[in-house]
Amino acid sequence: MKVAVYPGSFDPITNGHLDIIERGSKVFDKLIIGVLVNVDKKGLFEIEERVELIKKVTKHIKNVEVISFNGLLIDFLKAYNAKIILKGLRAVSDFEYEFKMALMNNKLDPDIETVFMMTSAQYSYLSSSSVKQVAKFGGCIEGLVPKEIISDVVRRSKI
């Protein structure tokens, strides 16, 4: 069974993330969405809220599981018998950072492979940070995040 982990802070989950999840779920037998605390970013949603938002927008995908974690990604993979890290790439600038992370993860555990998946072109500009910025200033986030969570993002952005 090919088990992959798609890690990220997903704060909030965007249509770009969902695109990778939907496509990744067709490639792997099981896809675990690893929701992490990113100490370098100020969060819009608490980790438990992010898990629930992701579950809400992925409930139609049967082989996806959403789990929060804190710590090393390699340890998370081992805990769930996963050998593959799935990473979405928007641009060459993403690749440079993700390539270094893939090398580090492989150094920590040579049995772990990182698979890169290009984001669909219509989402190549999209990031959680840009969604937060647009929502904070009252802009329309329709088409940027799954419709099921638009009201959650708008409501939280006004706080």
Curated annotation (Swiss-Prot):
Binding site for ATP: 9-10, 17, 88-90, 98, 123-129
Subcellular location: Cytoplasm
Main location group: cytoplasm
Alphabetical UniProt keywords: ATP-binding, Coenzyme A biosynthesis, Cytoplasm, Magnesium, Nucleotide-binding, Nucleotidyltransferase, Transferase
Cross-referenced Pfam families: CTP_transf_like
InterPro entries assigned: Cyt_trans-like, PPAT, Rossmann-like_a/b/a_fold
Coiled coil: none
CDD domains: PPAT (cd02163)
A Gene Ontology term for the protein's cellular component: cytoplasm
Domain of life: Bacteria
Pathway as given in its UniProt record: Cofactor biosynthesis; coenzyme A biosynthesis; CoA from (R)-pantothenate: step 4/5
Record function comment: Reversibly transfers an adenylyl group from ATP to 4'-phosphopantetheine, yielding dephospho-CoA (dPCoA) and pyrophosphate.
Family to which the UniProt record says this protein belongs: Belongs to the bacterial CoaD family.
Subunit structure: Homohexamer.
Protein name from the UniProt record: Phosphopantetheine adenylyltransferase
Protein species of origin: Clostridium botulinum (strain Alaska E43 / Type E3)
Underlying gene: coaD
